[in-house]
């Protein structure tokens, strides 16, 4: 089979391992890495395959950097119209919380934290905001403890001992 059929079989295998039509023994959801690098058409098809097996499965996409060098994150709304993902990993939340609670020189005021979080809520349909995958760190970012002792860095920019000899890994 081609790649599409291979992925469809994976969805069936993990969504209903014994193939009895009852997805209770399968996975409850899917986290899709670097999802912005795959076309919207494929994700629409993927959602259909998932819903065929388990209409209640949670689909979360990692839609992150639109322009990493300039610290611009995607507005993930195009993936969240009800035909692709249920949610995305909310790195915009993580960056705002880091700036408010951990940064020192570049700390933001409570009003700015409120503005940033309100912007995230406003960018998505009302039913999407409550199910976004809010996170403070991940396998792609430095650990929260490392962020705390290395304040005032851009989220996911030059945050490792390899890139900065003075970086304190926790």
Where are these regions (language model features)?
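Short, solvent-exposed beta-strand-terminating loops
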Residues: 141-152
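Short, intrinsically disordered, charge-balanced linker/junction segments flanking boundaries
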Residues: 1, 162-170
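Chitinase-like catalytic core of GlcNAc-active glycosidases
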Residues: 1-8
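Hydrophobic side chains within well-formed alpha-helices
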Residues: 3, 132-135
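Active-site-proximal helices and loops of the catalytic beta/alpha 8
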Residues: 9-12, 19-132, 151, 157-161
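Extended catalytic-interface subdomain
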Residues: 134, 139-142
């Amino acid at each position: 089979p081609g790649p599409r059929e291979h992925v469809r079989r994976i969805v069936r295998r993990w969504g209903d391992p014994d193939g009895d039509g009852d997805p209770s023994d399968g996975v409850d959801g899917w986290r899709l890495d670097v999802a912005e690098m795959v076309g919207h058409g494929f994700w629409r098809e993927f959602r259909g395959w998932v819903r065929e097996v388990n209409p209640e499965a949670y689909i979360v996409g990692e839609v992150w950097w639109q322009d990493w060098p300039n610290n611009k994150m995607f507005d993930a709304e195009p993936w969240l119209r009800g035909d692709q993902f249920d949610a995305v990993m909310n790195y915009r939340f993580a960056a705002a919380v880091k700036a408010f609670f951990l940064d020192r020189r570049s700390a933001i005021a409570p009003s700015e934290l409120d503005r940033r979080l309100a912007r995230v809520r406003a960018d998505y349909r009302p039913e999407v905001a409550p199910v976004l995958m809010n996170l403070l760190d991940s396998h792609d970012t430095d650990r929260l403890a490392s962020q705390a002792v290395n304040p005032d860095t851009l989220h996911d920019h030059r945050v490792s001992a390899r890139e900065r000899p003075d970086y304190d890994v926790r």
